[in-house]
Amino acid sequence: MLKNYRKTKILATIGPSSEKINKIEKLVHNGVDAFRINCSHTNVHQLSNYVKNIRTVEKKIKKPIGILIDLQGPKLRVGEIENDSMVLKKGQIVVIKNSSKSSNKTEIPIPEEKVFKSIKVNHPIFIDDGKIKLKVLKVSKNIIQARVVLEGKLRSKKGINLPETILKNSALTASDKKNVRAGIKLGVDWIALSFIQSPTDIKDLKKICHKNISIMAKIEKPSALNHIDKIAKLADGLMIARGDLGVELPIEDVPGWQKRIIREARIHGKPVIVSTQMLESMIISKTPTRAEVSDVATAVFEGSDAVMLSAESAVGDNPELAVKMMNKIAHSVEKNPNYSSILSAQLEKTPDSTPDAIASAAGSLATELNAPVIVCYTESGSTGIKVSRVRPRQMILTVTPIIETARKLTLVWGVKCIVQKDANNLEEMIKITKAFSKKEKIIKVGEKMVITAGLPLKKLGTTNLIRVIKVD
């Protein structure tokens, strides 16, 4: 078996603590499969540099690395505070102004006119994932007076949630469209759409998105939960954005919804990412809390395709340690004797299609024959994704001639992808795969491989073949 093979993927956010080429390489070496670029804190120039550095590492180590850009969406954020931060005390009366910058040390700027038009007296204002809570006392044209209910240190650019205030927003802002165009030009692999409220939001993004770029629907609004089935059908993947979700919903409801969203993603055969505060204490600490370890482990046990690091890897003191810890937790869970049976018990009925039936049969056949690997030949990646949905015990070795497909699959559970442009027919593919598998000690002479593919090879979406070969 490949050294350090792990089925659950790690998505790390890139930022000041991890943007340099040598640091990116170290993070990949320690377990990162793909990188997230948070457009809320990144301009187009920085976005270009991040992508360039990641691709430089990818070329050097000859391993596909996925890139996901996370659009800000209609996210409300605090403007620029004087000296970048201010301390709010419980009971303190604060002034909020419709401005991009504060004019004094006690003023909170919110550069969003629609907030001042829509918010009402007694409405709550949550800031920084609910760490700070204000209650509105008075509203005028461009000024809000509020009382501090939950105190804390407020920093510039922190997110704002208004769970009782109705704002009419499109999930795709003008700034988002600019970042989408930049992402397409730079060749990113995934685009995460924030604050989705309905399937229409995904359709709007698809109209301007390149066909090679996959759409990740971020689930962080109660209205999205009301349409979760349709959103899961339309999107290419789901991200459980627990920060805003835990502010918009009662926080105690989030774990139950996490299970439900993972289940919906798996029903529809879409990769799902669990994100936000997974190893939060490791922003400054060299070790996580026991609760954080349990949180990551729970996401892995529930069958999440990927777990995500946010500030831990973007601005934290110890990005490498955070990645190493997440890697160790995932490995430990996957070695648990109950892991595979738990995932199998969670599997819903196989969708009624030939490709899905073949993917399911490949998993069963590999188990019956004690085959250590399932090989998928794919152009679009769909064969590998369908086999992944079954959560087989075996490695899923996906072979594709398209580097963009390999990058996309870095966020799909269990998939190890190799790019091979030389094969023009199935027999050549089998020969190449045998050689690679023996070289990497994935399989021994005399063992069997289960192969799935679509014939003819170059035709998309035609998974119609299952075959068993013996390695000689």
Give a label for each model feature:
Residues 1-472:
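Non-catalytic helical/linker scaffolds that mediate oligomerization, partner binding
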